[in-house]
């Protein structure tokens, strides 16, 4: 089986992290976002993954060649010369997707969940139509485009953009499975699959919805990245609790790379991910944070709801909070207060940042 992953975007919502690393390679819970998806696809029997790429594709290609060997699969890159939206990339990769008549998966690159690929395939084969989209339940449907479908069969009737009156609380979760016949609908030009292709398929009775069980998050921006981390760690707690760090000083769900070094009298958690080679000195307090590879947090600093970029350094007695994001190789001097700052790569912070802002 095959899968196409849409990784062509610039990752602007996840800046400053994506200024130096393409979004699919940003580590989410100590593994690149893309690998969470690819490994789940391989588990479900996918043997050929096609990446629809544009931005920073050399870095992606290098990383994926190594993974190709490790996972024993084929990975192809389909290069967009211009942005093709969410449907155009399927037309661009048409030849790769249609060399047999098997259905294929399509994924948005920002989605994290308990990927239900086996269930999707079964459901798709049962109804026998051209397309299946996974839907997930949300608390505030008025913020999203919702999917209206028959509860028993899953047949989709229509899509409603940001409804002011309740019609459904199910939204498109960014995971699809299609039969190759569906590709005849798409031309090689910038096209939105959600706005231009799906409504026509639904009208013709060719599109079905499968409801996702378990957690789901679009982790394309920092606050959602952190929320998604909390959900993912809770899922690890339920399915593989031995992967989480326990013991004195660790509270709740904490994932620590074995190469990280943690000093005395630290309090870590709940909901913390600590990457490879990270150093936390004595007396550090961290909650609801992701600390990426090679970062160094000096003694007695206090971090909550932050993402600390690769090889960044946070001084002593610093307080950082409110979705502060440090890009790669940022230095924060001692005894500063950082509130909701977005700090671009390779910057040094010498003064406190009392109000949320971008530091360039």
Curated annotation (Swiss-Prot):
Segments for region (Substrate-binding domain): 2-222
Can you tell me which residues form the catalytic site? 162
Q: Which domain of life is it from?
A: Eukaryota
Location of region: Hexapeptide repeat domain: 245-360
Instruction: Give any single GO term for biological process.
Output: GDP-mannose biosynthetic process
Q: Which GO terms describe its molecular function?
A: GTP binding; mannose-1-phosphate guanylyltransferase (GTP) activity; metal ion binding
Q: Which GO terms describe its cellular component?
A: cytoplasm
UniProt xrefs under InterPro entries:
GMPPB_C, GMPPB_N, Hexapep_transf_CS, Mannose-1P_guanyltransferase, NTP_transferase_dom, Nucleotide-diphossugar_trans
The entry marks the following residues as binding Mg(2+), namely 110, 218
Signal sequence: where? Answer: none
Record's keyword annotation contains Cytoplasm? no
The pathway is: Nucleotide-sugar biosynthesis; GDP-alpha-D-mannose biosynthesis; GDP-alpha-D-mannose from alpha-D-mannose 1-phosphate (GTP route): step 1/1
Q: Which cofactor does it need?
A: Mg(2+)
Kindly give the SUPFAM superfamilies that the UniProt entry links to this protein.
Nucleotide-diphospho-sugar transferases
Q: Which CDD domains match?
A: M1P_guanylylT_B_like_N
The note describing how and how many cofactors are bound reads: Coordinates binding with substrate and required for enzymatic activity.
| Residue numbers binding GDP-alpha-D-mannose | 110, 218
Deleted gene: phenotype: Morpholino knockdown of the gene results in smaller embryos with multiple anomalies, including bent tails, hypopigmentation, microphthalmia, hydrocephalus, and reduced motility. Caudal primary motor neurons are shortened. Muscle fibers are sparse and disorganized, and the myosepta are damaged or incompletely developed. There is also evidence of sarcolemmal damage. Immunostaining shows defective glycosylation of DAG1 associated with abnormal structure of the basement membrane.
Q: Which reaction does it catalyse?
A: alpha-D-mannose 1-phosphate + GTP + H(+) = GDP-alpha-D-mannose + diphosphate
- What regulates this protein's activity? Enzyme activity is reduced by incorporation into the GMPPA-GMPPB mannose-1-phosphate guanylyltransferase complex. Allosterically inhibited, when part of the GMPPA-GMPPB complex, by GDP-alpha-D-mannose binding to GMPPA.
Keyword Nucleotidyltransferase: yes or no? Answer: yes
Q: Whom does it interact with, and what assembly results?
A: Component of the GMPPA-GMPPB mannose-1-phosphate guanylyltransferase complex composed of 4 gmppa subunits and 8 gmppb subunits; the complex is organized into three layers, a central layer made up of 2 gmppa dimers sandwiched between two layers each made up of 2 gmppb dimers. Catalytic activity of gmppb is reduced when part of the complex and binding of GDP-alpha-D-Mannose by gmppa induces allosteric feedback inhibition of gmppb.
Family under the similarity heading: Belongs to the transferase hexapeptide repeat family.
Protein name (database record): Mannose-1-phosphate guanylyltransferase catalytic subunit beta
Q: Which organism is it from?
A: Danio rerio
């Amino acid at each position: 089986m095959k899968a196409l992953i849409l990784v062509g975007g610039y990752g602007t919502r996840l800046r400053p992290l994506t200024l130096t690393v393409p979004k699919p390679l940003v580590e989410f819970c100590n593994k690149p976002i893309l690998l969470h998806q690819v490994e789940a696809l391989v588990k479900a029997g996918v043997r050929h993954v096609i990446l629809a790429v544009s931005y920073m594709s050399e870095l992606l290609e290098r990383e994926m060649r190594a993974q190709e060997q490790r996972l024993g699969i084929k990975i192809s890159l389909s290069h967009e010369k211009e942005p093709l939206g969410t449907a155009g990339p399927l037309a661009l990769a048409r030849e790769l997707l249609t060399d047999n008549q098997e259905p294929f998966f399509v994924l948005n690159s920002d989605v994290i969940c308990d990927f239900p690929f086996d269930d999707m395939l079964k459901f798709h084969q049962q109804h026998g139509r051209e397309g299946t989209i996974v839907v997930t339940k949300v608390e505030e449907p008025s913020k999203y485009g919702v999917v209206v479908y028959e509860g028993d069969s899953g047949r989709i009737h229509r899509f409603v953009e940001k409804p002011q009156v309740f019609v459904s609380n199910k939204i498109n979760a960014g995971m699809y499975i299609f039969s190759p016949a569906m590709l005849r609908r798409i031309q090689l030009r910038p096209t939105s699959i959600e706005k231009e292709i799906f409504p026509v398929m639904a009208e013709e009775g060719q599109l079905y919805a499968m409801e996702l069980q378990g957690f789901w998050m679009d982790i394309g921006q920092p606050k959602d990245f952190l929320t998604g981390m909390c959900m993912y760690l809770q899922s690890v707690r339920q399915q593989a609790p031995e992967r989480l760090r326990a013991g004195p000083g660790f509270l709740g769900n904490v994932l620590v790379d074995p190469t990280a070094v943690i000093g005395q009298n630290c309090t870590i958690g709940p909901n913390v991910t600590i990457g490879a080679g990270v150093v936390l000195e004595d007396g550090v307090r961290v909650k609801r944070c992701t600390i990426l590879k090679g970062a160094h947090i000096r003694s007695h600093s206090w971090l909550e709801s932050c993402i600390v970029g690769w090889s960044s350094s946070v001084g002593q007695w610093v307080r950082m909070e409110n979705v502060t994001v440090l890009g790669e190789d940022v230095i924060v001097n001692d005894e500063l207060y950082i509130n909701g700052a977005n700090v671009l790569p390779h910057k040094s912070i010498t003064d406190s940042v009392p109000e949320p802002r971008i530091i360039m």
